[in-house]
Each structure stands twice: as C-alpha cells, then as structure tokens.
C-alpha cells in the first residue's frame, strides 16, 4: 500500500465512522460516497464494485485483499446496526449502569428514625372552604385528621379551581374528576375510621404530564405523543395512591420536558401572566394558583427549581437516587429526578415521606431513610456554608435569608469551592436523550412535534463520539469528588454572591425553550434561578444549577422577597434563593427553608388570578 495515499484498514474505519457520525449514521463504517451509491441502488449491503469505484473517486488506493476486508467489515456492521434498530426498546428499559451521588468523602445517615411533623396552631375551617386553597398541606392534613373537612370537599374545591382558571393559566392537560372523586371517597371512609395512611392522606395533588397514569393520556407535552396512553402507573403514582393522596389532574409540561410551551400553548405564571418557567410549568402554575394541594415535578436541568422560583414555591429537587423515576419519560438516565413542588417546605417533607423509598424497578435508587422531625434539629447547630460571604456584591435575597437565619441563631460559615478547571458537565444528558428518542428521530416522528426544532438536539446526539461521552463521564466523577471534598461536614449551603434575585430560566427540563446556557464560575456554587419566559431561554436553571445537578445534590428553593407591584405583576413577582445540601441532606435543607418561612411568612401571599 502506498504510504502517502493509502491508509490502514483501522485508520479508514475511524474516518468512515467520523463521516457517518456527521450525517447521523455513526453506527456504520462506510464513507459518504459509498453511502450515496447504496441509496441510489437501494442496496442494504456494500459490493466490491461499489467500494472500488468509491475509493477511486476518493483518490485513495487499496489492494484487492484490503478492499474485500473492508467490504466484509462494513457489511457486518451494517447488519448489526439494522438488527439492533429493528428492536423496539420499551421506555422503562434503562442502560445497565447508574451513577451514585455517594462518592468518596460523602457521609450519609443510614439509621431510620421516627417521622414526625412540626406543631401547628389550633385550626378552624374558614366560612368559605375556598379560603383554604392556599393553605399549606400541613394545615390541610390537620383539618382532615380532625375531621373538620372531608377529602371530597377539598377535591371538589380544587377541581373547580382548576377548571375555572385553566383557560388563562393553561396548566392542565387532563382533568381526572371521576378518578379523583373515587379516591377522595375512599380516603374519607378510611379517615372516618381513624386510619391515616400517610401525612398526605386525602390531599388532592397533580402530576406533571410526563408521568404515566394507567388508562389516561400521558402526552409529554408534544403533538407527537398527544394521544399516548400507558397501561401502567408510574411508581410515584402508585406510592401516593397507597399513601391515600388524591390525584386530580395531569399538569402541563414543556414539550418533551423543555420550556413552558406545549401543544396547547404556553403555561402561565399566576404572579405574572406574561412569564412562565418549565419544564414543570403546570405543577408550578397550578400549585402557585391554589389549584392543587401539591404537585410532582421532574428535573433534568432545572425543571423543579426554576419553575419553583418563578412561581414562588418551596420546590424540592431530591438527591439523585432518592425517588423512583419508573414510569416517567426519560431525558437523562443519569440526571433525571422527581420531586415535590409545594407552597411550604414542610409540605415537601410530608410528600417525601411517601415517595422517598426503593421500588424494585428504578435500580439507581439508594435505600437511605428519609428522616423528618423538626424537633430534632437546632438551627444553631447546623453547619451552613455560604459562598461569596465576604463578597462586596451580595445578592439582596441572599442577604434577607442570612438576616433571618442569624436572627434565629444560625452561624454562617464561609465556604470556598475551588476552581477545578474541568469542562462543563451539563451536556451529558444530550447523549442520553438522543438514545431515548432515537426511534422518534428514525421514524420521522419529529415532524409531528409541536416544535420540530426541539428534535435537533436528539439528532445532534449522533454527531457525538462514545469515547468522548465516557471521558466526559469520568471528568464528571472528578467534579463530584471535588465537590464532595469542598462541602464535607456541611449540612447545607447557598451562594451570597451576585446582585440580582437569581438567574433567568433554562433549557431541558428548564425554563426557556431554547436550551441551557453556560455554567456559572466554578468558584461559587450554583446561584438560584428565577426562571425565564417560556420560549425565551436564557441562563436558566439548566446552566445555573449545573454542578450540583450533575453531582446529584438536593436543593430547595425558598422565596425571600417580592418585586415591586407592576401592571404585569399586580402584587409583585417572587424572588428567592436555592439552598443546596450534600447528598441525602434533604431534611436539613428543608428545615432551614421552613425556619425562614415561619419567620418571613411570604408563602402566605397570594397571586391575583384571572378568569
């Protein structure tokens, strides 16, 4: 073989693979010219004549033995690729590898402790039942326990509000009136006998519409799937049903868990109808509007924290491996999480009591007990880290949080997370979503999407090299280890640096519709998102929570102030801070958020709703 014009078979294979990756056919080993000839003839196999002609056009030479070897190898790979793609892979089948948020340096409490709730004042039902629509789940549960109100009454009230306000808010895809009333009646019968299945027994709730409910449409927010029905419930639906909660609606998601736009329009934020945040847009909007007791959202890159920020909620993104994803649409097997979106931090703990447990289906789950009892915690003894504590440019919302925590006796400790000079880690889900939606792309289903441009990310996954993906995963592990070392010994932390109320909303399972932006400087942890306009994109929670998100850390958003009232936002828009914790420290960060809320009482503020 000539040294200048010819190449080894191994080198040619690499070049063939690189070329076919660029045209979305990375599983094959044939050059572009050869592929064109195959298309012209309709052949599924390469012939020696095809290869010989293509090599001449390409200006390279191989001897007969080398050409035949190339034909054999290419045809073998083509046959394997065709065979692999002929299989339909069910949605619930995951790759046989999982990440674990517990890396060297992470210490977790594996001792189960009794679950207990904080004390509440004596409660009495107002003259009009609808006045409790914005009450914390903690208070609603007490009304049910003391039999001052029935689950049927609460369910009817919340369903009526969902129907009344949905025309403006567009936060509901499917109303589950009949199912809800059946579950509410069953809850009342058990509560009347003194049987409380869980802290959320009898509480009406809604789930994001990427979570399957047997026999009902699960649309994923997309025109390509708007008639999709599964014959099984997601684990989280089963768990909450077993806990006696009452499912009343499938709530909107941005198309395929991105942004706030779906096939029915753009879901609205009740504080400001001109803005929104996703992709858990419906859960955020419905909870903030007092149309459900609580909701379940999902997050890959910001889709719980960002809409919680925009809608003024105490939304919890649990530790990766804490809550089952079985039955929920996948964007990233090593990123996706499900969690509660509530008005009050302790409400999140009540929901977590039911859903934070292994289910035997999602093999990424860790059997770490979720322990909640506010009486066990002392704010003075928790180690709370603050990055940028001595910054000349303090985020005013961080300052409000710090002022209250200091008032309660907390000690705030400066925390430094050193630069690691490693690449960004928030693009890894692109590979994973490309695999999950591979059949959609190959079948031409992208054309049926409400926004076909959303499918470009799925297609681009085929431009990526599997070696790069694995190397990026190793770098991700380095980042996780560095973060674990930096936060070792801390119970919680947040960022004080920055001048605003947070960042705008984000990409996949984040606020905007154009995708995520860059990660903030690695010297500080993620600054909390405020959420962006649906369809707007911007720095989102997608980019803004990158390190803690990729590391699997929990976070809870808490409202610390409201902007000045305006024409668009009659009572102002919520602003706040996200409190993060090391893996499986949900109870600690929820306790800190609850402690702030109990003083500030901002969670009792209500938006002005339109009909």
Q: Residue ranges of each PLM-predicted region?
A:
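Short glycine/serine-rich loop/turn segments
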Residues: 199-338, 387, 497-539, 565
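An N-terminal boundary/leader segment
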Residues: 2-182, 403, 407-408, 605-611
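Acyltransferase
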Residues: 148, 155-156, 185, 393-416, ...
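Glycine-rich, small-residue loops and helix-cap segments
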Residues: 147, 202, 242, 246-248, ...
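Short, well-ordered beta-strand elements within core beta-sheets of diverse protein domains
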Residues: 139-146, 225-228, 336-343, 459-464, ...
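Short helix-loop capping/hinge segments that flank enzyme active sites or metal/cofactor-binding pockets
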Residues: 118-131, 200-220, 378-387, 427-484, ...
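A short helix-breaking turn/cap at a secondary-structure junction
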Residues: 118-123, 317-398, 598-611
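N-terminal, positively charged, Ser/Thr/Ala/Gly-biased leader segments
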Residues: 169-220
């Amino acid at each position: 073989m000539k040294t200048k014009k010819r190449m080894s078979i191994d080198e040619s294979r690499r070049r063939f693979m690189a070329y076919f990756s660029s045209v979305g056919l990375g599983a094959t080993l044939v050059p572009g010219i050869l592929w064109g000839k195959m298309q012209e003839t309709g052949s599924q196999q390469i012939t020696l004549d095809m290869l010989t002609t293509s090599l001449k056009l390409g200006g390279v030479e191989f001897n007969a033995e080398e050409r035949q070897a190339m034909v054999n190898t290419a045809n073998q790979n083509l046959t394997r690729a065709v065979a692999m793609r002929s299989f339909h892979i069910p949605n619930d089948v995951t790759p046989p590898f999982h990440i674990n948020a517990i890396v060297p340096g992470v210490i977790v409490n594996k001792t189960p402790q009794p679950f207990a709730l904080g004390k509440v004042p004596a409660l009495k039902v107002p003259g009009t039942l609808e006045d409790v629509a914005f009450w914390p789940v903690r208070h609603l549960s007490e009304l049910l326990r003391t039999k001052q109100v029935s689950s049927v009454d609460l369910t009817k009230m919340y369903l009526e509000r969902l129907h009344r306000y949905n025309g403006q808010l567009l936060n509901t895809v499917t109303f589950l009136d009949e199912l809800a009333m059946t579950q509410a009646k069953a809850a009342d019968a058990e509560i009347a006998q003194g049987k409380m299945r869980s802290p959320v027994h009898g509480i009406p709730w809604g789930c994001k519409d990427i979570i399957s409910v047997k026999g009902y449409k699960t649309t994923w927010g997309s025109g390509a799937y708007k008639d999709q029905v599964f014959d099984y419930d997601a684990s989280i639906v089963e768990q909450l049903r077993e806990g006696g909660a009452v499912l009343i609606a499938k709530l909107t998601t941005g198309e395929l868990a991105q942004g706030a736009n779906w096939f029915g329009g753009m879901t609205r934020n009740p504080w400001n109808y001109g803005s929104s945040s996703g992709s858990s847009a419906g859960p955020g909007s419905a909870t903030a509007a007092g149309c459900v007791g609580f909701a379940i959202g999902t997050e890959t890159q910001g889709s719980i924290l960002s809409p919680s920020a925009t809608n003024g909620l105490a939304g919890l993104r649990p530790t990766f491996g804490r809550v089952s994803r079985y039955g929920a649409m996948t964007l990233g097997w090593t990123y996706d999480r499900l969690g509660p979106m509530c008005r009050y931090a302790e409400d999140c703990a009540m929901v977590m009591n039911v859903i934070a447990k292994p289910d035997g289906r999602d093999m990424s789950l860790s059997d770490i007990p979720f322990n909640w009892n506010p009486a066990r915690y002392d704010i003075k003894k928790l180690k709370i880290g603050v990055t940028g504590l001595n910054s000349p440019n303090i985020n005013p919302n961080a300052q409000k949080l710090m002022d209250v925590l200091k008032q309660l006796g907390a000690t705030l400790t400066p925390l430094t997370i050193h630069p690691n000079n490693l690449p960004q880690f928030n693009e890894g889900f692109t590979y994973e979503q490309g695999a999950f939606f591979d059949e959609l792309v190959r079948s031409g289903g992208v054309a049926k999407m409400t926004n076909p441009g959303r499918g470009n990310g799925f297609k681009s996954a085929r431009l990526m090299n599997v070696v790069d993906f694995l190397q990026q995963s190793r770098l991700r592990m380095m980042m996780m280890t560095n973060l674990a070392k930096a936060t070792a010994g801390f119970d919680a932390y947040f960022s004080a640096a920055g001048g605003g109320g947070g960042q705008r909303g984000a990409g996949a399972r984040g606020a905007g519709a154009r995708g995520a932006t860059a990660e903030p400087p690695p010297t500080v942890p993620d600054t909390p998102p405020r959420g962006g306009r649906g369809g707007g994109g911007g720095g989102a929670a997608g980019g803004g929570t990158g390190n803690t998100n990729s590391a699997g850390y929990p976070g809870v958003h808490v409202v610390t102030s409201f902007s000045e009232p305006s024409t668009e936002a009659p009572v102002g828009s919520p602003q706040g801070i996200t409190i993060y914790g090391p893996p499986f420290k949900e109870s600690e960060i929820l306790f800190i958020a609850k402690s702030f809320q109990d003083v500030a009482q901002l969670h009792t503020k209500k938006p002005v709703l339109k009909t």
